[in-house]
Each structure stands twice: as structure tokens, then as C-alpha cells.
Amino acid sequence: MHTKTIFTMLTVASAATALTACADPTTTTNPASSTTTTTASSATSYDISSIPTVDDIAALVPDDVKMRGTLRNGASTGYAPAEYMDADGQTPIGYDIDINKALAQVMGLKTGETKHSEFPTIIPALGTKFDVGISSFTITTEREQQVNMVSYLNVGSAWGVATGNPKNFNPSDPCGTTIAVQTGTAQEEYAATLSDECVAAGKGKITVMPHELQTDIATKLIGGQYDATLADSTVIGYTSTQSGGKIEQIGETFESAPQGIAIAKDDAQLTEAVQKAMQYLMDNGYLTDILATYGADNAALTTAELNPSVN
């Protein structure tokens, strides 16, 4: 993990760069009980049938993946609009799911298959259970030491509250509040860092409530159990829409950080194939079109960098 700056608690905005820090996927704080699971309503997936196979890229695909014919993706499917379950509760949908299918199409494979996996378990399963991890992974130096990361999105972070802000949450001073986050995300570590700053300043600590699924947070936030939630800006916007306006963003979006596709560190061949397939999707407008289906096209990057330098 790269060195993080210790921030003053006068303004949250000044601490935004902490969100590039990787959360320790083995650590949780005050785990929340997730007894109610909400499922986002069905969305129209992007039709990948018009995306061609690119022979030069298909030639790079490792033989075992070619033989299988499937690009296996692990994703924590409770983080709409990136990855979540359809109304049937069984079918993964979202822009990351469509991106995996599009990559498979470019690489000449039969399909891209996504299976749900709890967020902290995805990276350890790369190279065995999964070929790729496309699940809103913020690119960090720690993750780049563990796996190869191919950049494709730039996503900020934002606070969300019940509409009207009935708890009077102040994003510039969240001390003494109860904040919901998804387990293993950059936002979980950021909230814990803010809590430490609060205590150091003689203020009340932040009670951080991690959930395995981001979708579990909405009901409890609306019901008044939490003061606020902290998540990717795309997630807050989508959650607001899906809640019928019962959740809203408060404050500005924090500084954006790149997200990447994770591939096993020792699989240079698959890494090259994924990087070039992603660049093809970018160059030909497919990535933007996929994201636009979910209202997230502003997050698209134009260069698929391998293990980019991050602060």
C-alpha cells in the first residue's frame, strides 16, 4: 500500500485523495447484519452481438481459455449499476458484466460469464476460479503488487443520504455519525481513516457499518438506521434513481480514481489480450456505449493502461 497523507478534519474534500488507498480486504469494522437484501430493478443490458472478433487479439488468448471458450469473471453483484442481480435474483447484470461479455467477444470466445463472489475473495481466486476480476476495483499500488490491473474507468466517490437529509449529516464534518460502506472497498478504509482523525481531534468516532452488498444499505439508510453512505459516485447516482428519489447525493463528488480489471500477476498472455481487447472497445466507442446504457458514460477512459502509476 502506498503512503497515505494524514488529513485534517475541517473539510472532507481535502482528504479526497485517500480514496485511492486500497482497503484491506481481510479487515472489517463493526460488521453490519445484512438480513434484508434488496434487488435493483431489471435493466436493459447492452447488445454485444455487433462487436466483432479481432483475430490478432484472439491469437493472444491462452490455450486453456480458448479451449474453455469462456472468460470467467468474479464480481460482487450488489454494486449497481456496475454489477448486481436482475429481478430474478439469479442473473448478474450491470456494465461490468456487459464489459466482460464484450471482451470475450473481441477475444473470439463463446461468452463472458460472471459469477458472484464476495468482494474480498475475488483477487485470491484469480488464475484458478476466475480469469478476470471486473468488479469496481480501484487501482492502488497494493493491488498492483498482487495482480495486474488494466484501467478502463475513472470514478469518483460521493456521500449519499436519505432525501431531505433527515439526520442533518454534514459531509464536511462526519464525526460522531454512523456510515454504511461496502466491505473491502476504498471507501471502507477512507471512513475508518476519517474516524481516526475525528478521535485525534477530540470529536466522536465514526461508526463504520460494512455490508457485503451495497444494495443492502439502501433500505437501512432510508429507514433511518444510518446517517449516510459512502460509495462510488456512479453507485450513489444509480441508487438515487432506483430508490425513486428516496436517496440523494450530498456534497460534491470527491476526486476521481481509476478503476481496473484484475488479472493474475503471472498470466502475462491473458493480461496482454485483455489490455488490447479493452483498448479496442475504447477506440471503437463500445465502452462508452456500454456505460451509457447505465448512465455512466462519463466514467469511460480512453487508454487501457497496464498497472498505471497511482498516488
Task: Indicate residue ranges for each PLM-predicted region.
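C-terminal motif of bacterial Sec signal peptides marking the signal peptidase cleavage site
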Residues: A18-A21
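Ligand-binding clefts/hinges and TM-proximal coupling segments of bilobed small-molecule sensing domains
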Residues: T44-D63, E189-V208, Q279-N311
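Extracytoplasmic small-molecule ligand-binding "clamshell" domains
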Residues: A40-G133
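A ligand-binding cleft/hinge motif common to bilobed small-molecule-binding domains
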Residues: F137-E144, A192-T193, G223-S256
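Bilobed "Venus flytrap"/periplasmic-binding protein-like clamshell domains
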Residues: P92-V106, F137-I139, G156-L213, A228, ...
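Bacterial signal peptide processing site
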Residues: A23-T26
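Acidic, polar ligand-binding/catalytic clefts
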Residues: G112-D173
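Periplasmic-binding protein-like
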Residues: T77, L153-V161, G237, T241-Q279, ...
